[in-house]
Amino acid sequence: MCCNYYGNSCGYGSGCGCGYGSGSGCGCGYGTGYGCGYGCGFGSHYGCGYGTGYGCGYGSGSGYCGYRPFCFRRCYSSC
């Protein structure tokens, strides 16, 4: 499981989850502790950031945008 509470990382600058250029997963971006971040995306399947299919941030397909608590919950439920 890519996105978790244990600090596992598969992207740079992320505390947990998937980061820059990841294939799938959700989690953290640049400098975030957990949840939805800014740099999680660029082709990630579930995540946050630019061009994501589901999640939060700029250009998300399903409209779960912004820096709201729902954004965090969505990322974990997506995983």
From Swiss-Prot:
Say yes or no: keyword Repeat present: yes
Q: Any idea which UniProt keywords this protein has?
A: Keratin, Repeat
Q: Looking at the UniProt record for this protein, which Gene Ontology cellular component terms does it annotate, in alphabetical order?
A: cytosol; intermediate filament
The record describes the protein's role as: In the hair cortex, hair keratin intermediate filaments are embedded in an interfilamentous matrix, consisting of hair keratin-associated proteins (KRTAP), which are essential for the formation of a rigid and resistant hair shaft through their extensive disulfide bond cross-linking with abundant cysteine residues of hair keratins. The matrix proteins include the high-sulfur and high-glycine-tyrosine keratins.
Question: Subunit structure, briefly?
Answer: Interacts with hair keratins.
What is the name attached to this protein's record? Answer: Keratin-associated protein 21-1
